[in-house]
Amino acid sequence: MKMHRSARAGLAAVAAAVVVVLAGCSAAPPPLVPTHSADTGALREAVSARDIMDHLEALQDVADANGGHRAAGSSGYEESARYVEEQLRAAGYAPVRQHFTYEDHGEEIETFNILAETGGSDEHTIVVGGHLDSVRRGPGINDNASGVGAILETALRMADSGIEPINKVRFAFWGGEEEGLYGSQHYVDELSGSEAGQHAVYLNLDMVASPNGVRFVHDGDGSTFGDNVPDGSNEIEDVFVDYFADRGLEVLPTPFLDGDSDYAAFLKAGIPSGGLFTGDAGTKSGAEVQGFGGEAGVAYDSCYHESCDTIENVDTDLLEEMADALAHATIAFATATPAEG
């Protein structure tokens, strides 16, 4: 996650004018109507915290062997990418690298995104993404190996399941997030007007295993924070909220903050967006402790952007819950149909 934020309403600098549709974009298609009743049990059962932790341990090993981090443009990032690509290829995907450069403190950084996709129609493409890079101060296991592991495991188990999606799902592992959301912005910038119009949903995972965390769902209907977001974002929020409610699990809304995570470029392009988050340097309240446990007056993740963001800095129960919710939402939108009208 690029910068400090709190999911608390009193501290939110809400990006009220975030929806600025890219010049030349074709009219957006009708929002997808997700399959809330989709049978996602088999996929959710296959996506386990145990297997996700294997990915996190591999990325921890990469950081340990490369100066303690996996920052974009570094050998640690390259080895992280190779690990993700090897896993995807073994499952039958054909991952591709999308290269780009940016300047950081006077230095030109060369890096890339990794993209891998399922079959299905590209007229209503679903992008499921999270950033692969870490800060240079630490290995970035909660931020954001946790999101990467959940996305990767969803992709692998989806391939194993033989699910044939109606809508193409593109799994994206972004580079250059920590210095300025460069990877996701590059991806959106490279879309033609017609391609942008074919992007129906963006699901973002950034920090989903915070040790003192909360189950946060992005406010897709603007009812809590007044976010001005693309039509269809409310459907994403509803899928997640309904999923957790059906399991008796409490959630709280969190705002979209401009420049905070990889959803920013998609929102600005008018692409319906949503996702999950468990907290960073913000302080957990007493009310949140009542609903989620943990310790009041302490950060959701005290190791946010620090060297202690290691494999020990992970709540595996929360990781399992968020990963299962992602698997459910991915299938719900992969099997969705456009709204009439």
Give short role names for the model-derived ranges:
Residues 52-60, 96-98, 113-117, 125-129, ...:
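Structural recognition of the beta-strand scaffold that forms the well-ordered cores
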